[in-house]
Amino acid sequence: MTTCTVDNAQRTAAKIAGVAGLVAFGLVVFANYVLLDPLIVPRNAADTARNILAHQTQFRVALTCFIAYGIGSVVLLSALYTILAPVNRSLAFTGALFRLVFAILWLIAPLNSLAALRLLGDATYLKVFEPDRLQALARVQLAGSFDDYYVGLPFFGLAATVCAWLWLKSNYIPKGLAIFGVIASAWCVLCAFIFLIFPNFNKIVNDYIFDSPMAIFELIVSIWLLFKGIRTPKSGEADLVAERSRKSVSLRLPAFL
């Protein structure tokens, strides 16, 4: 026998979270690895500048994808708050706040990229600078996007850690998956802070190992939520959830938005 601890708003939010998570994941992978990476030539500002100028539309589409990813992150955090608030409203709010901070920091990257485009433009006031200096400055702007991501990564990791813990307490998803999420997300937070203090840390632990386990967790959860939805915990599994879920949970945005 089961106790109904999941209402229709949570079920709808689960579908929204699944779609938002998958779309956001697809956008960032496509923008990074299909559109942007081919244009960037490591340690060569001049070739990078020429590639960007020759493929401005491709470059701008990548920026648009990054902006859409930020929007998707806000949709995702709102849906996750709706799902997880009955488990622990304060923790769900904290997780949503961490993810919002990450989304805001993420949007600095498109601004840096637009600044790089401006430096490579043909405006009259740029004529006072040598072309190689402008190319170097544009490359610095692009490199700043890397810094933006790693400043935001601890917030992303903390958001994922909080959510994974709430998934574990709620029994809405398989327990093993939730435990993996807690470990992967906490690992990401640890690596992010170590890397910010010791920038050569990525020579010991590859950058991709910082956040890939957490990204895999979020991807699997998104697929689960979209196709499986959230499970109704068995009687006695989550008494706290059962008690709090009697209250109406709406799909409104958290109060801080």
What residue spans do the PLM features occupy?
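Hydrophobic, aromatic-enriched alpha-helical segments typical of multi-pass transmembrane helices
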Residues: M1-V249, L253-L257
